[in-house]
């Protein structure tokens, strides 16, 4: 009898798992083999070889990721940037033009402005809150629109449904980076996005021990992206596949805890006299709060804030806290703290960061699984020193 797999918690544990179990192993084994015996395949891309991303470890992940977002297909990659690169090279091709949200992850921004020109591709940035202005950015060679579910690092929520509708009206591919939300809080295919991209390094894995990426969406597009990735080589090795697969099984438990803790911490920061601004879509005063409520099942574990003392106060705060680790990245079990100006968005010039609203004193917090009460007490102590 087929196993009943409906809810997302059940999908995390059972979707895509081999039936029958391989050798009876309850935990998916690692297939640490670069190649597999020829079995009569007639297509190059069907040959069983790690670079084709078609080992048993890859296949389980692809099926599980597609099931989580109620999408048609998925492919894992060697990093989040490998996933973004393979997707955009495929969709834009030679000479394609992209319309992108103006506040994005620093690595994505650098790809757009530094590498795109070398590949004959171009980008124009748009205000994600102003759909009426997007048409001005369209060119004859525009191929896609790119947004983030929750922007990094200002936690903005663009008009995502408008992005989907705009793409459909203009024959574009709609692409979203869903890393900050995760499939627990948002499933882009359900509102019509063609492609959803993740840095699997973050929430999907959740244990800060691998680098990985994923593209989820329409089967025809994912197949093309898979072929591109095969040629570019940005694949995920079987051991990393195993760690990603293991981490995903606890995704719901982790993300729901992080949702709850981040909201509690954001509300506390919002009331503190030393804090001038808190960016978290779960706060009623956030400009995109109502939109986030309509779209998401939770508001995520990421927030950012500014202190009254600006850069100096931010540097002192980051040095004084004792629980958060001062490091880039996010989505793990440990709370991480960083200033985007000298980590995730260091590749942007000061002028570019200023235009994006990213001050040098902005502090970004990735809330982990520690006690939220302990974190708040730690923050209170660090702020009280001044």
What do the predicted segments below correspond to?
Residues 2-9, 216, 277, 331-332, ...:
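Positively charged, small/polar-rich N-terminal and surface patches that mediate targeting and assembly
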Residues 30-31, 39-60, 67, 336-361:
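Glycine-rich phosphate/pyrophosphate-binding loop
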Residues 243-253, 301-308, 364-368:
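Short, well-ordered beta-strand elements within core beta-sheets of diverse protein domains
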């Amino acid at each position: 009898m087929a196993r009943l797999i409906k809810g997302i918690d059940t999908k995390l544990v059972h979707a895509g798992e081999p039936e029958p179990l391989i050798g009876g192993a309850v935990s998916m084994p690692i297939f640490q083999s670069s190649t597999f015996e020829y079995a009569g395949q007639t297509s190059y891309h069907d040959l069983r070889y790690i670079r084709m991303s078609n080992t048993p470890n890859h296949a389980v992940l692809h099926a599980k990721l597609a099931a989580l977002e109620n999408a048609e297909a998925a492919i894992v990659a060697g990093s989040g940037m490998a996933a973004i690169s393979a997707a955009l090279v495929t969709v834009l091709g030679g000479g394609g033009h992209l319309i992108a949200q103006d506040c994005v992850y620093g690595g994505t921004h650098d790809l757009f402005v530094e590498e795109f020109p070398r590949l004959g591709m171009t980008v124009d940035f748009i205000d994600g809150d102003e759909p009426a202005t997007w048409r001005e950015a369209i060119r004859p060679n525009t191929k896609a629109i790119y947004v983030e579910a929750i922007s990094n690092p200002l936690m903005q929520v663009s008009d995502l449904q408008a992005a989907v509708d705009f793409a459909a009206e203009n024959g574009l591919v709609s692409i979203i980076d869903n890393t900050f939300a995760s499939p627990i809080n948002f499933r882009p295919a359900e509102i019509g996005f063609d492609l959803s991209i993740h840095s699997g390094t973050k929430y999907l894995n959740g244990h800060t021990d691998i680098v990985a990426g994923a593209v989820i969406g329409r089967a025809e597009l994912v197949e093309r992206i898979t072929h591109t990735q095969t040629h570019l080589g940005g694949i995920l090795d079987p051991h990393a596949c195993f760690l990603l697969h293991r981490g995903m099984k606890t995704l719901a438990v982790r993300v729901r805890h992080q949702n709850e803790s981040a909201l509690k911490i954001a509300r506390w920061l919002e009331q503190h006299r030393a804090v001038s601004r808190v960016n978290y879509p779960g706060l009623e005063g956030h400009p995109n709060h109502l939109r986030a409520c309509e779209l998401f099942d939770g508001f995520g574990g990421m927030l950012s804030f500014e202190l009254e003392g600006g850069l100096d106060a931010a540097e002192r705060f980051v040095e004084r806290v004792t629980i958060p680790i001062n490091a880039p990245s996010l989505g793990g079990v440990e709370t991480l703290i960083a200033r985007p100006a000298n980590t995730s968005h260091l590749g942007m010039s000061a002028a570019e960061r200023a235009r994006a609203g990213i001050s040098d004193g902005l502090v970004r917090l990735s809330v982990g699984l520690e006690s939220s009460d302990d974190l708040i007490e730690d923050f209170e102590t660090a702020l009280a020193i001044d």
